[in-house]
């Protein structure tokens, strides 16, 4: 996993973002802007050929964080890459004294919801029409407890 990203890494993240999220994808400029804040957590995962196959961007504000973007290359989903990436991210956020982590997930993305629930994220709200008029997002939250390692249940 890479936490020190070079320009070409950011370009690869933007390309993967575009392939995963189409019209809802963040621009290269938006991704770069999140890298400017040293408190934020941005991690990329590469395969054996230095291709970026996953990434996560979390914004830190005081003792809270929000996972803004999280993507795994389609053909690599279901292989534990997202689980590992989320675990490392939560550990890094904990080291930054973050107490609560929030994220939004599409109501129809059951696989992602199960992943988050395995890390003890709880549904705390809903944003109606967030992804489209008929597609809400669930707001989920996890409390990071001091002195414990982050574990996700399989």
Question: Language-model segments: what does each one mean?
Answer:
Residues 3-75, 86-88, 92, 96, ...:
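Acetyl-CoA-dependent GNAT
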Residues 58, 92, 112, 124-126:
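Structured catalytic core of nucleotide-sugar glycosyltransferases
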Residues 78-92, 110, 114-118:
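Conserved acetyl-CoA-binding loop-helix of GNAT-fold acetyltransferases
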Residues 104, 117, 122-138:
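Conserved catalytic-core motifs of GNAT/GCN5-like acyltransferases
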